[in-house]
Amino acid sequence: MNSLFASTARGLEELLKTELENLGAVECQVVQGGVHFKGDTRLVYQSLMWSRLASRIMLPLGECKVYSDLDLYLGVQAINWTEMFNPGATFAVHFSGLNDTIRNSQYGAMKVKDAIVDAFTRKNLPRPNVDRDAPDIRVNVWLHKETASIALDLSGDGLHLRGYRDRAGMAPIKETLAAAIVMRSGWQPGTPLLDPMCGSGTLLIEAAMLATDRAPGLHRGRWGFSGWTQHDEAIWQEVKAEAQTRARKGLAEYSSHFFGSDSDARVIQRARTNARLAGIGELITFEVNDVAQLANPLPKGPYGTVLSNPPYGERLDSEPALIALHSLLGRIMKNQFGGWNLSLFSASPDLLSCLQLRADKQYKAKNGPLDCVQKNYHVAESTPDSKPVMAAEDYANRLRKNLKKFEKWARQEGIECYRLYDADLPEYNVAVDRYADWVVVQEYAPPKTIDAHKARQRLFDIIAATISVLGIAPNKLVLKTRERQKGKNQYQKLGEKGEFLEVTEYNAHLWVNLTDYLDTGLFLDHRIARRMLGQMSKGKDFLNLFSYTGSATVHAGLGGARSTTTVDMSRTYLEWAERNLRLNGLTGRAHRLIQADCLAWLREANEQFDLIFIDPPTFSNSKRMEDAFDVQRDHLALMKDLKRLLRAGGTIMFSNNKRGFRMDLDGLAKLGLKAQEITQKTLSQDFARNRQIHNCWLITAA
């Protein structure tokens, strides 16, 4: 009896144990990452030919303690390598694991290689050659703490390489994991199987091979036992012949069918090629099709299973499309696949919950470094009384109501950018802004007391509902997460896409960037204030401090300002402001842009202006500013400096976002100034629900 070890992906060990026992293995013992088992020579070959789940089958040769590199060398050399393979055979060493002595796997592999070569040369035998790419013998050494385990890898290449897939092609899941997904899906061979996002067809091919009793090792050309001196060619040929006979019989007797589709024509062509090379091409119908066009291929029955590994995303900007995809798939399943089963394997359990289906079973597994889950569902047959359930239905109803109200109003106003929803319902704590045919959803970061998983699921429901209610393409929705603002975090960079969208606001044309920054380049709540500045600016010299992207300057320029001066500390935003001015034909010496610390510039400037707009941060302690700034504490000092630049009869429009801001009217009076609060006049319909989003004042000489 041979003592053997079969490795597998984490989470598949028990499934592999059952498979090996069915092949005739005895004394099976599950450990993390594999199964120890025993069997005769025939069982060795049977496990190599028939295991759909094992990554490798290895023959343990021994263990040794490693306290120095010499210990490793001597421990390896103690094995009788000259009885394992002939000197004419090539070999390779795979070394994994480190300890205090062996700190580099390449160094460990070199010491093992030296020990094996010296085992031959000391017996005056020819030196065996190393072949890293296609060796006759593979030696596997795993170092864990002070113990090195040495084994002969009888597989050669990993057993996931069945021989039907182009090795250069990328695959999101290995064939061994795909086989496990099929086994756990609840699908019964003989019933239809459909994969609507099949990629190169791995799940369907593994299922078809399982259903037709086709051995996964039947198409492999190389094995790790070819140079092994104990290899029994006669028994191997018997195992191989039996597999060929069973495959022919299984294919001839199989009557059901498999269906695969994908939106990428190139991968569908690859899937057809893979299926043909696997010997089951005639059983699978592949077609180029998007999930949105998914239809039941057998509407009159029989019932089958939809099985897939849908895409997932690690970047925030990919989530809206994925949420929409899963939400759409859930609706299609309910509408067209009543009575069928559904099984999805994913690295994102939150996305699976967008299906709005209740899972009957779920399994965990690792796909490389990723923690994944497989969930199985049964789709109930629809009845005349069945009503579709909308995710976040209360939110969807409110958004629908707001859309009806604001869409018509925005057209009448001549604006393309407005707020559709602003945390109207406390449990749906987001802001939804429309920018022409784009939508930005801003999630306010939930309190730490809220379960993170529930918060994420609610956000996914919000996105699915937003896409559905507004009827937008998923790639036109931008998702952002932000803390509740204590000031304008306008300088926080999020990305590098550099994609700008031209929008209109009354008679102004402006550039916005929806993806690269926390803010978009246009503060929507200041829309009316900007229009007022345009109406007040004719024939006047206009100053815009803390100008951001200069949208207020554009309105002043279009309103007939004699000159405009735009000051901001950020070169990025000044360049953006220049683009905005140029877009509206406002160029030349009359329109100056100055990069400076606004507070320092204000103290040193000696010019005069008729109209000044200042919208400072609530608080700032930027390293590039000379002093920390607090708008509540420092607004009087600010007004003192502004008064010096204000021409007789001139006006300052002062705005800030500090909740509960209190204007020091007595202090202003001592400066010879008076203030009129115009906050309510500057709040448009879309911000009427949030009366504290900003406060705004007109300040003139007393």
Curated annotation (Swiss-Prot):
Residues 43-154 form the THUMP domain. GO terms for molecular function: 23S rRNA (guanine(2445)-N(2))-methyltransferase activity; RNA binding; rRNA (guanine-N7-)-methyltransferase activity. Its EC number is 2.1.1.173, 2.1.1.264. It comes from the Bacteria. SMART domains: THUMP. One of its GO terms (cellular component) is cytoplasm. PROSITE patterns: THUMP (PS51165), UPF0020 (PS01261). It is an enzyme of class 2 (transferase). Its main location: cytoplasm. It is found in: Cytoplasm. It catalyses: guanosine(2445) in 23S rRNA + S-adenosyl-L-methionine = N(2)-methylguanosine(2445) in 23S rRNA + S-adenosyl-L-homocysteine + H(+); guanosine(2069) in 23S rRNA + S-adenosyl-L-methionine = N(2)-methylguanosine(2069) in 23S rRNA + S-adenosyl-L-homocysteine + H(+). Belongs to the methyltransferase superfamily. RlmKL family. HAMAP family: 23SrRNA_methyltr_KL. This is Ribosomal RNA large subunit methyltransferase K/L. It comes from Escherichia coli O1:K1 / APEC.
